[in-house]
C-alpha cells in the first residue's frame, strides 16, 4: 500500500498526512473522505479536526506539545506541525528520527525527505499528533482506483464499444490496402500494361473506400450513443450524489467549483468513449504497420525501429510536463468559474456599492492567472507536436533517401519503395496521435480525481430509518446538545430545551447566540457532536431526512425562489399542484390581491430567485410555500422582517390558526410585534438558555429580554415623536 500521499491543494496537508499514517497501518481511505471527517475548510485542518478524524477511522489519537527530546521517544509514524519559511502552517508525517537526520513524508510533494536536525528544529512548532490503532481499527481498503471506475463506466456498454473497436480495426486494415495498391500499380500493372487488372484493383479500391466510409459512419453513431449514456451516468449521478451530501459540503465548497466538475465529467467521457478506442486503434495500426514494413523490406524497417525510442522519449517528457500543468489549469479554471458565479449572483450588491472595478479586478486577476498556466500548457503541446512532426518528417526523408539507394542497387523495387513510403505515412499519424494522447490522458486522470473525490464523500444516511408521520409528532426535546461548525466555532455546549407541541414558542437573542443554528439542527442539516434531539420519543438520528423535512417546514432568513411561476414556487416539489390548497393558503396570508395584480396572476414568471418581486413579496411567497405543505412544525426565522404591518397581521392570524390546530410554531425574531403573540419566549445567549418564560413574565424581570424589550419600546416611542 502506498504510504506517500500528495496533497491536492494548500488546505489538504493535514488530511493527506492522516491518509499516509493510515496507509502505514494498511488502511486505505480517500483523502476527500478524511477531509470530511476532519472538518477541513478553507483555512485547512486544525489539531482537533485531525484527532476527531483519526477517531472516526478507528485510531486512538492525541494532540500534544513536546520538547525536542520527546521527538526521539514518541511512537512513529506521527504527525508534526511545522511552519515553512516562517509563514506557511503545514503538517508532515514523522517517519524516523536518528542522530543525524529526521525523516519525514511531506504531502507538499508526496515524497520522503531526510532533514538535518537544525533545519527541522527551526520549522517545528512543538505540536504533534500521536496516532495508534484502537480496538475498533480494521485493516481495509475503501479506495476505488480510477481504473475500476473507468471500467464500471465502460462495462454496461462494452458490447457497443467492442463493436466500435472491431469496426475501427477493420477500417484501419482496409486503409493499409492503399499502400499495397500503389506497389502493385507501379511494379505490375504499369510495366505489363495489364488494363483488366488495373480495372479490377480500381473497383476493389472504390469498394474498400465505400466500406471504410460505412464503417466510419456506424462507428461514429455507436460512439455518440455510448457517449450520451456515459454522460447521463456521470453527470446525473454526480448531481444526485450532490443532493445527498450533508450541508457542510455546500458551506465549504463554492458553487463554481461544484459546477466545474461537470466539465470534468465531459473530459472523462471523452477519454472513455473516444480516446481509449482511438488509442487502442492507433497501437494496432502501429503493430500492423511494422509487420507490413518488415514484409516489404526488413532493412528499411530497422530504420523505423530505431526511431521508436525517440518517440518514447518525447512521450515521457510530455507526460512529465503535462502532469502538473494540467491539474493547475483545471484548478484555476474552477477558481475563475467560482468567481464568475459569485459575482453574477451578487450583481445587485456590486451595483449598489459601486464595486464594478473591484469585481473586475478580482475576475481579471484570476483570468490572467489562468491564461498564464494555459500558455505553459500550450508550450508543452507545441513542444510535443513540433518534436513529433520533426522526427516524422526526418524519418520520411531518411526512408526515401536510403530506400532510393536500395532501389538503385536493385535490392528493392520502386513499387515496394512507394508501398513502404505509404506505410510510413500511415505509421507517423498514429505515433503523433499516441503522443498527443498523453495530454488527454492527463486531463482525464486529473478530471477523474476531481470528480470522483466528490463521489468518495459520505452521503446523508437514510438506510434503516423511521418515516416520521404527522401523528407521531409531539414535544421537541434538546437533551445535552453539543454542537459546533466544523472543528472551530462552538455554538452549543450541553443545551437542554423543551418546546411544547401546539404552542407558539419565540426564540430571541443577540446575533450569534445560536437561534438560526437551532433551526438547522431541528431539520438535521448538521450532525451533533453529542446529545440528542427528539420529536416526541423519536431521535432525529433515527428518522429519514425526507420525512422529517416534510413534517418540519422552515421559512429561512435567506429565501431561495426558483425560476418558475407563482404556483411553481408555492407548491414546489409537487408535480401536480393542488390549486385549491394554493388559493386557500394565499387567502389566509392576504396574498391573493397582490398576486392577481401581477401581469399573469398565479402564472406570472418570477425570474431567477424571484428577481421581479420585492423583499416583502418574496417573504410572503416563502411563508405560503411552508404552509402549503401543511406541516406539523412551522419555523419562521426572521420571516416577517420585510413585511408591512398589514401583511404581518395576516401572518400572525394564520399562526394563531395553526395553534388552534395543535400545530407547533417556532418564531425566531427580534421584533416585538412577532414575539407578542408567543405563548412562551426562550432567550439564548452564547449558546445557552438564559431566560425562559411568558412574555409578561420576562418583560418585568431584569435580564437580556427586558433590555431588548425596553430598547425596542424606546425606539418605537422615538419614532412616534418624530
Task: Please describe what each predicted stretch is.
Residues 1-74, 87-88, 98:
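Cysteine-nucleophile protease catalytic domains, especially the papain-like/related folds used
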Residues 159-184, 201, 205, 223-224, ...:
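Alpha-helical segments in transporter systems
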Residues 162-215, 222, 294-299, 410-414:
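Transmembrane helix-loop-helix hairpins at lipid-water interfaces of multipass membrane proteins
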Residues 203-212, 216, 278-328, 399-412, ...:
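Transmembrane helices of ABC transporter permease
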Amino acid at each position: 500500500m502506498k504510504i506517500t500521499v500528495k496533497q491536492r491543494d494548500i488546505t489538504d496537508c493535514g488530511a493527506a498526512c492522516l491518509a499516509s499514517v493510515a496507509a502505514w497501518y494498511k488502511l486505505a481511505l480517500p483523502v476527500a473522505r478524511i477531509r470530511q471527517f476532519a472538518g477541513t475548510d478553507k483555512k485547512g485542518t486544525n489539531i482537533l479536526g485531525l484527532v476527531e478524524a483519526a477517531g472516526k477511522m478507528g485510531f486512538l489519537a492525541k494532540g500534544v506539545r513536546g520538547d525536542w527530546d520527546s521527538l526521539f521517544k514518541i511512537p512513529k509514524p506521527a504527525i508534526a506541525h511545522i511552519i515553512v519559511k516562517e509563514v506557511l502552517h503545514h503538517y508532515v508525517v514523522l517517519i524516523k528520527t536518528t542522530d543525524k537526520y529526521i525523516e519525514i513524508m511531506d504531502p507538499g510533494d508526496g515524497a520522503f525527505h531526510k532533514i538535518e536536525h537544525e533545519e527541522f528544529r527551526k520549522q517545528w512548532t512543538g505540536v504533534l499528533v500521536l496516532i495508534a490503532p484502537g480496538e475498533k481499527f480494521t485493516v481495509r481498503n475503501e479506495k476505488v482506483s480510477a481504473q475500476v471506475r473507468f471500467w464500471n463506466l465502460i462495462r454496461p456498454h462494452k458490447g457497443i464499444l467492442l463493436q466500435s473497436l472491431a469496426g475501427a480495426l477493420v477500417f484501419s486494415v482496409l486503409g493499409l490496402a492503399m499502400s499495397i495498391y500503389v506497389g502493385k500499380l507501379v511494379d505490375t500493372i504499369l510495366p505489363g500494361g495489364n488494363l483488366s487488372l488495373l480495372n479490377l484493383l480500381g473497383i476493389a479500391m472504390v469498394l474498400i473506400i465505400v466500406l471504410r466510409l460505412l464503417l466510419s459512419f456506424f462507428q461514429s453513431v455507436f460512439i455518440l450513443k455510448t457517449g450520451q449514456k456515459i454522460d447521463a451516468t456521470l453527470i446525473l449521478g454526480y448531481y444526485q450524489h450532490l443532493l445527498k451530501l450533508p450541508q457542510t459540503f455546500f458551506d465549504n465548497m463554492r458553487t463554481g467549483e461544484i459546477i466545474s466538475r461537470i466539465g470534468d465529467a465531459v473530459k472523462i467521457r471523452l477519454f472513455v468513449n473516444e480516446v481509449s478506442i482511438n488509442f487502442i486503434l492507433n497501437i494496432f495500426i502501429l503493430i500492423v504497420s511494422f509487420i507490413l514494413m518488415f514484409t516489404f523490406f526488413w532493412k528499411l524497417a530497422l530504420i523505423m525501429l530505431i526511431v521508436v525510442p525517440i518517440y518514447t522519449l518525447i512521450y515521457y517528457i510530455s507526460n512529465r510536463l503535462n502532469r502538473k500543468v494540467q491539474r493547475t489549469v483545471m484548478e484555476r479554471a474552477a477558481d475563475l468559474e467560482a468567481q464568475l458565479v459569485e459575482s453574477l449572483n451578487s450583481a445587485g450588491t456590486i451595483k449598489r456599492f459601486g464595486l464594478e472595478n473591484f469585481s473586475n479586478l478580482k475576475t481579471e486577476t484570476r483570468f490572467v492567472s489562468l491564461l498564464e498556466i494555459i500558455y505553459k500548457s500550450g508550450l508543452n503541446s507545441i513542444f510535443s507536436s513540433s518534436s513529433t512532426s520533426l522526427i516524422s518528417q526526418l524519418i520520411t526523408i531518411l526512408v526515401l533517401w536510403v530506400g532510393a539507394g536500395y532501389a538503385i542497387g536493385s535490392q528493392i523495387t520502386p513499387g515496394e519503395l512507394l508501398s513502404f513510403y505509404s506505410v510510413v505515412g500511415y505509421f507517423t499519424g498514429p505515433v503523433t496521435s499516441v503522443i498527443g494522447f498523453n495530454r488527454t490522458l492527463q486531463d482525464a486522470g486529473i478530471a477523474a480525481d476531481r470528480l470522483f473525490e466528490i463521489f468518495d464523500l459520505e452521503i446523508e444516511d437514510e438506510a434503516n430509518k423511521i418515516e416520521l408521520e404527522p401523528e407521531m409528532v409531539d414535544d421537541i426535546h434538546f437533551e445535552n446538545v453539543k454542537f459546533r461548525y466544523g472543528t472551530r466555532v462552538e455554538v452549543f455546549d450541553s443545551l437542554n430545551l423543551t418546546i411544547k407541541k401546539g404552542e407558539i414558542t419565540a426564540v430571541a437573542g443577540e446575533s450569534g447566540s445560536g437561534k438560526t443554528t437551532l433551526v438547522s439542527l431541528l431539520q438535521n442539516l448538521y450532525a451533533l457532536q453529542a446529545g440528542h434531539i427528539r420529536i416526541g420519543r423519536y431521535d432525529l438520528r433515527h428518522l429519514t431526512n425526507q420525512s422529517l423535512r416534510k413534517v418540519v417546514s422552515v421559512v429561512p432568513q435567506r429565501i431561495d425562489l426558483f425560476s418558475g411561476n407563482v404556483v411553481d414556487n408555492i407548491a414546489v416539489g409537487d408535480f401536480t399542484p393542488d390549486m385549491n390548497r394554493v388559493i386557500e393558503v394565499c387567502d389566509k396570508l392576504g396574498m391573493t390581491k397582490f398576486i392577481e395584480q401581477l401581469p399573469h396572476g398565479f402564472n406570472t414568471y418570477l425570474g431567477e430567485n424571484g428577481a421581479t418581486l420585492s423583499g416583502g413579496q418574496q417573504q410572503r411567497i416563502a411563508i405560503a410555500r411552508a404552509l402549503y405543505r401543511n406541516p406539523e412544525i412551522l419555523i419562521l426565522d426572521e420571516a416577517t422582517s420585510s413585511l408591512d404591518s398589514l401583511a404581518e397581521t395576516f401572518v400572525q392570524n394564520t399562526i394563531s390558526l395553526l395553534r388552534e390546530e395543535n400545530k407547533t410554531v417556532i418564531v425566531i425574531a427580534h421584533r416585538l410585534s412577532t414575539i407578542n403573540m408567543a405563548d412562551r419566549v426562550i432567550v439564548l445567549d452564547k449558546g445557552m438558555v438564559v431566560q425562559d418564560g411568558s412574555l409578561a413574565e420576562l418583560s418585568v424581570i431584569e435580564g437580556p429580554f427586558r433590555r431588548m424589550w425596553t430598547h425596542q419600546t424606546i425606539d418605537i416611542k422615538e419614532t412616534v415623536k418624530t
